[in-house]
Amino acid sequence: MNKIAWAERSCKTNTIGTVNILEILKLIKHKTIAVFITSDKVYKNLEIKRGYKENDILGDYDPYSASKASADLAIQSYYKSCLNKNKNVKIATARAGNVIGGGDWSPNRIIPDCVTKWSQ
């Protein structure tokens, strides 16, 4: 996959996909909890020797990180502008590192490691 196609796919999956889910949550009439698992890639890589903090700068120089940060910002803005008014919907985000990606079954990823352990 060339870089432009990869960038477009990242944006569609991470940003637009998240917005699609948020739009559905606006319509929910029953009690629902949505947990968005994002990534540490939402943060700008400053090459610091500590873990990221919630108030660190979002976004970086590659399309993948930008799409992750955009999704995270969409979640925040939807919550502040409309979802906080719907008492049936609760949302949360969790920024985890090394969860999984499309076709990513590398070792030391949360989802593949869980699947491996559960299947034993």
Language-model-derived ranges and their functions:
Residues 5-23, 30-33, 42-99, 105-106:
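Catalytic helix-loop patch of NAD(P)-dependent Rossmann-fold dehydrogenases
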Residues 39:
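Residue(s) in the substrate-gating loop at a strand-loop-helix junction
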